[in-house]
Amino acid sequence: MPDSFPTTDMALTHILVVSDVPESNRWYQDVLGAEQYREYETSAVLSFNGVWLLLVGGGDPTPDKPEVLFLPPDARKVSHSFTVRVENCQASYETLKGRGAEFLTPPYDWGGEIRCFFADPDGHLWEISQLTA
């Protein structure tokens, strides 16, 4: 039997638990330029450069995840982040800052990479990174 995972017709979806779905939905569209695919009462589906983002308002355990709670993150503790590779970190920084992104610092040159970080309204961490070496 041929291997059935992964296949070429698969798509990766990131589930982001947020405290306010409409606010986060607006932020992802206005700041990151994501496109809304669908919106529901307690969630929204966005497309961002070929990746699906599912914004959900939290949730209790369900039969298929019996001991798992979906909770918004603690912005001071990060166990996951997104990195977007860009050609020009400074230009991307200026664009995103102009759209309302709040950066932790301006771009920093590590010698081989220039990067900086910002967070969405709930503290999900995003990085823009330019490889220079």
Give the positions of each predicted feature.
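Short, conserved charged micro-motifs
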Residues: E23-S24, C89-Y93
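Vicinal oxygen chelate
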Residues: M1-T13, E35-V84, Y93-A119, Q130-A133
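Conserved active-site tyrosine of GNAT-family acetyltransferases
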Residues: S24-Q29, L96, G123
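Major-groove DNA-recognition helix of helix-turn-helix-type DNA-binding domains
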Residues: L32
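Conserved beta-strand-loop-alpha-helix junction that forms the acyl-donor binding cleft
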Residues: I15-V21
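Acidic di-acidic motifs
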Residues: D20, N88, D120
